[in-house]
């Protein structure tokens, strides 16, 4: 099976920033950095940029694509709810697709940001593709559930979005490796952007490996966050610096 491992290097000092939501949350989110090249989402499809259900209004504001992930900022508003107790992250259950057909697979995605007033939360969401994104396109998102108070409260509804994105290739590159590390693990390629490092691997069936990444000085990139998806074998690691 194939595997994807993504690491976020905190390179904020070296990165290219737009105002509004990205500027307000970029230093505190998991995939930190400066999003100057983020694009205000055009109003051509205004009806697909805002959705309301169960008393919660969600509005997409900006989008940025580094070549592997699409980062979208959202504003969550609800007059009858208090977001001040939610900390810096709200989890939502989503289905999303980079093609015309919506995926039927549910994914828990974090809205990473902050509460700006009692009834308004702003944050950034990160959507990953299975491989490197080579062309501009449209990300389709369906939010099914909003989880509050550490998933103690679930609000089910339907919030649908169509987000056009542009691939920014500056500072991003894919490096072919094609190296077998041992009898059951090979590294196919590595994708590097200002926001993350993605390692594409191939593992033989039934065997799972632990992977460590090192910078150019031989220093190990530390891990803060690990997420695993066993079939399709996706692993994500959060790094503190390279």
Model-derived regions, located:
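Alpha-helical, hydrophobic structural elements that either
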Residues: 5-242
């Amino acid at each position: 099976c194939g595997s994807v491992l993504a690491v976020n290097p905190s390179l904020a000092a070296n990165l290219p920033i737009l105002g509004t939501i990205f500027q307000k949350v970029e230093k505190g989110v998991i995939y930190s950095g400066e999003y100057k090249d983020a694009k205000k989402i055009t109003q051509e499809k205004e009806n697909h940029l805002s959705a309301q259900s169960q008393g919660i209004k969600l509005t997409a504001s900006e989008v940025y694509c580094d070549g592997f992930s699409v980062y979208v900022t959202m504003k969550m508003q609800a007059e009858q709810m208090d977001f001040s107790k939610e900390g810096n992250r709200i989890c939502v259950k989503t289905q999303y697709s980079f093609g015309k057909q919506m995926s039927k697979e549910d994914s828990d995605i974090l809205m990473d940001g902050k509460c700006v007033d009692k009834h308004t939360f702003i944050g950034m969401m990160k959507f990953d593709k299975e491989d490197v994104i080579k062309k501009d396109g449209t990300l389709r998102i369906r939010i099914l559930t909003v989880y509050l108070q550490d998933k103690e409260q679930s609000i089910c509804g339907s919030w649908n979005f169509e987000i056009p994105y542009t691939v920014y290739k500056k500072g991003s590159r894919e490096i072919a490796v094609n190296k077998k590390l041992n009898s059951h693990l090979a590294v196919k390629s590595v994708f590097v952007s200002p926001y993350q490092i993605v390692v594409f691997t191939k593992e033989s069936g039934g065997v799972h490996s632990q992977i460590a990444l090192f910078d150019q000085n031989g220093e190990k990139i530390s891990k803060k966050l690990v997420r695993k998806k066993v079939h399709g074998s996706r692993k994500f690691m959060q790094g503190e610096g390279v």
